[in-house]
Amino acid sequence: MNTQSIGAKGKSKAAKGIAKRHRKQSSLSDSISKPAIRRIARRAGVRRVGGGCFKEINNAAREYIRDTLSIACIYATHAKRKTITCSDILHSLKRMGIKYIGY
């Protein structure tokens, strides 16, 4: 006997009770993933990344982004805008002492 009714889309009735597999949730939902950190490290020339480094890299990246965005927000509010533009980010990086060429 056919478990799937005629014209029905999706899975059969027999497969409805099967548990679905879920990805493991990380403790920091807004953190950078380990593979992403490895890719960035590879671009910088690093061959291996120690296990204890990931948390520190996440903290440093979060602080760097927070500082950059807070300065960019100051530029946007001074210009009476609610949207942060690319030039706001470039000015905030310049204020932090980082020269970014290409934009």
Curated annotation (Swiss-Prot):
An annotated GO cellular component: nucleosome
Alphabetic keyword roster: Acetylation, Chromosome, DNA-binding, Methylation, Nucleosome core, Nucleus
Keyword hit for DNA-binding: yes
Modification N6-methyllysine occurs at: K16
Basic residues bias (residue ranges): 10-25
Modification sites for N6-acetyl-N6-methyllysine: K16
DNA-binding region of this protein: 20-24
Subunit-level organization: The nucleosome is a histone octamer containing two molecules each of H2A, H2B, H3 and H4 assembled in one H3-H4 heterotetramer and two H2A-H2B heterodimers. The octamer wraps approximately 147 bp of DNA.
Family under the similarity heading: Belongs to the histone H4 family.
Stated role: Core component of nucleosome. Nucleosomes wrap and compact DNA into chromatin, limiting DNA accessibility to the cellular machineries which require DNA as a template. Histones thereby play a central role in transcription regulation, DNA repair, DNA replication and chromosomal stability. DNA accessibility is regulated via a complex set of post-translational modifications of histones, also called histone code, and nucleosome remodeling.
Protein name: Histone H4
Gene name as annotated: HHF1
